[in-house]
Amino acid sequence: MVVFDLLGEEVDFRPGQYFWVTLLDPPYDDEKGPRRHITVVTSPTERGVLGLATRLRDSAFKRSLAELPEGTEVEVEQPKGSFALPQETDRQYVFIAGGIGITVFRSMLRYIADEGLPYRITLVHSNRDRESTAFYDELRGLEAANPNLEIVYTMTQDPGWEGETRRIDADMLRDHLGDLDTHTYLIAGPPGMVEGVTGTLEEAGIPEDQIRSQGFSGY
């Protein structure tokens, strides 16, 4: 996780939005350049900072991020994006995350906890194994403190995991949620995972206006 100090500036954003970040003097560069859009993992209630979390990959941008010395300045543009925490609190929400797609939901759930908002949410988070699961302990803590939050973890390649191990599809969701029609779904993760989960929900008869999604590609 990388945290940027806003140096006293106030930046207003909705949980789930993203920012364009430009590395001003990166140690590595490639044809994609030093500018990327990144979903913020911190909440608007965490004033004065913007945090991002990503899987480390062998791209110039990520290698540069990993090696930035403390105090390095970067350029952060104004927030964008419509994949944000819905304003309606009277619905039953299902947040579905694949891997590092959890970042967007960490921002939302942290905000809900800090503001004491009455959302009813089931978070379904799919990972390869427990070791690679981001924010596991923190999110379990939020779940323990909020009776309106339930978390379902599925570890698809972890022999030692004693919980759910299936990939996310309509049958798996139905086993944990019951009637799928009564929920509104927010889906974030790798594009293939997002497409697959969206497709299985549509095949189960869930209307388009109850499904919102955002893919996270490598950068």
Regions found by a protein language model. Give the residues of each.
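FNR/FR-type flavoprotein reductase catalytic core
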Residues: 48, 57-219
